[in-house]
Amino acid sequence: MRALLTFFVAGLLVLSSPAMALFGNNQNSSFASGSNDFVPVDQAFPFNYFQQDHRITLDWQVKEGYYLYQQRLSFSAENVVLGDIQMENGQPYRDEFFGDVNIYTNPLFVNIPMQDWQPGAKLIVQYQGCAKAGFCYPPETRVIDIASFTNGDMAPATMPTQTASPLDTSTANTSTPQPLTQQDQLASGLADNWWTPLLFLALGVGLAFTPCVLPMYPILTSIVLGSGKLSQRRALGLSLVYVQGMALTYTLLGLVVASAGLQFQAAMQHPYVLIGLSILFVTLALSMFGVYTLQLPSSVQTWLNNLSNKQQGGSSTGVFAMGAISGLVCSPCTTAPLSGALLYVAQSGDLLTGGVALYALAMGMGIPLILVAVFGNKLLPKAGGWMDHVKTLFGFVLLAAPIFLLERILPEMWSTALWSALGIAAFGWLYHVKNSLEFGGWKQSAVGIIAVLGLFASAQPALNYWFADSSQQAQTSEVSFIKIRNVEELQQQLALAKQAKKPVMLDFYADWCVACKEFEKYTFHDPAVAAQLKQFVLLQADVTRNQAQDIELLQAQQVLGLPTIDFWDAQGNPVSNARLTGFMQAAPFLEHIQRISN
């Protein structure tokens, strides 16, 4: 899925990497010493602003041969509410420092509406630019004093142009651009595109092949194709009704998650919910294996039969309800694309736009299901013994879903064992039934070879884990965290770290967070990363239970979702723009923490 997402957003997302050697010791300028060809940053990008009514306009005059990065523009405020920021998109550019980016080579104007400003109101503007000749300036920060503005209707006359004061460099963040996480890349890449719904539609098609959505194929097939011989038109109608139920439910759930934040997301992924859904999938799988037959009470069957007789070929109401239920079942599978979609909705603040986008995402998930329902009878061979094999195969597919859900709350050893056991059972069954297949010759031999290779591939992860050498196991124990449970304990640890003059890393963790476990397995215990992390005071907040103190801590740190990692410098100050919200591989994570520790 990660590979699919990477391919899909390759043309949309901006990848940022560390800048190359920057900046000398010239105290009177922001440019590198030893080169007289570059002007100071204030001459390269003269920055001014003016205000009219309840709107402030920021103005950059870009010198010829220089450019500003669109991705490095950021605006934040204190004691004032900012409206929707209005600015034009930059032009695509290939930069030796940051790769494919959008830049501004002409004067740039940014309009920002403001309201409800209070005493001490400030607007903090951050930007960064480079010279085409191969030189990059550090990020610049300007603070605009809004408190002097009148909090009421002003005359239409434009105020005199003013120059914002630079932020004190002792507290300003002058780090190089931070690498974007997978979720941030998706959210930023989808923003401000009129064709966003089409992108979400394509993402939905990819999500249709994840472990939680794939088991919906046999369910839909039994609903639409299993109720009798249906025409293509009837099958198309019922499948569309099914997908509409799933899409509407998915859209509502997504909007609730985006508006309610992490609390609802955590509740939907609570261990009790995950265990309940896993039991449901196992129950369905056992019925596919013929252990028992699931059937409704006779009274309900009679009611459904009567309703089915009234609606020839199937119940649209029942199909819609099943689609809605499938939307609920699939909701805990918050893979990186779905998390990015929800992050996009939360950032946009436009529920209508967000609703349309998430509806398109769910419709994309339903497209493969519709194709199976409409063309299934033509694509599949005639009825025969193969149907029992297909039924058993779907049983194994159904068993993959509970493992996918439970690995969020199970130790890695057990999740690895479950995946290996499922693979061994599935490929062992395939090898057992190969001689009973209706075709023979080389096709039967190919099935046997696939089964044998699958058996070895399934057993290897468990063997690698259980028989790992002692050095690998010791490596896993190198990184240890100080556990914190609430805001008070966080403040205590920050105070102790400040006294020790050590930077701090706080990792928000939950058992149901897959990416949190990926951080733990692939990133934190990388030898180079583990060595660099020794310079930090490592804190971890386990919010699995989503208790009151967990919620208070998440709200205090303004955490919208997991994984989230925050950083403080050795002076106890939060490191601006250093937060990570999504999985990051060891190499870019190492660069990230090296910049912070240095």
From Swiss-Prot:
| Keywords for the protein's UniProt record, in alphabetical order | Cell inner membrane, Cell membrane, Cytochrome c-type biogenesis, Disulfide bond, Electron transport, Membrane, NAD, Oxidoreductase, Redox-active center, Signal, Transmembrane, Transmembrane helix, Transport
Q: Which HAMAP family match?
A: DbsD (MF_00399)
Please state the Enzyme Commission number of this protein.
1.8.1.8
Claim: NAD is one of the keywords in the record: yes
Has UniProt tagged this entry with the keyword Plastid? no
Q: Where is the composition biased (Polar residues)?
A: 159-180
Start and end residues of each Thioredoxin domain: 456-598
Give the subcellular location: Cell inner membrane
Coarsely, its chief localization is: membrane
Function, please? Required to facilitate the formation of correct disulfide bonds in some periplasmic proteins and for the assembly of the periplasmic c-type cytochromes. Acts by transferring electrons from cytoplasmic thioredoxin to the periplasm. This transfer involves a cascade of disulfide bond formation and reduction steps.
What are the boundaries of the signal sequence?
1-21
Q: Under the GO molecular function aspect, what terms does this record hold?
A: electron transfer activity; protein-disulfide reductase [NAD(P)H] activity
Question: Where are the membrane-spanning stretches?
Answer: 198-220, 240-262, 274-296, 324-346, 353-375, 385-407, 414-431, 446-468
Entry's Gene Ontology BP terms:
cell redox homeostasis; cytochrome complex assembly
Q: What is the lineage of its organism?
A: Bacteria, Pseudomonadati, Pseudomonadota, Gammaproteobacteria, Vibrionales
Family as reported in the entry's similarity comment: Belongs to the thioredoxin family. DsbD subfamily.
Provide the disulphide bond pattern.
130-136, 212-333, 513-516
What Pfam families does its record include?
Answer: DsbD_N, DsbD_TM, Thioredoxin_7
Q: Which PANTHER family match?
A: THIOL:DISULFIDE INTERCHANGE PROTEIN DSBD (PTHR32234:SF0)
Disordered as annotated region, ranges: 158-180
Q: Which named protein is this?
A: Thiol:disulfide interchange protein DsbD
> Can you supply one Gene Ontology CC term for this chain's record?
plasma membrane
Q: How does it sit in the membrane?
A: Multi-pass membrane protein
**InterPro entries registered for this protein in UniProt:** Cyt_c_assmbl_TM_dom (IPR003834), DsbD_gamma (IPR035671), DsbDN (IPR028250), DsbDN_sf (IPR036929), Thiol_diS_interchange_DbsD (IPR022910), Thioredoxin-like_sf (IPR036249), Thioredoxin_CS (IPR017937), Thioredoxin_domain (IPR013766)
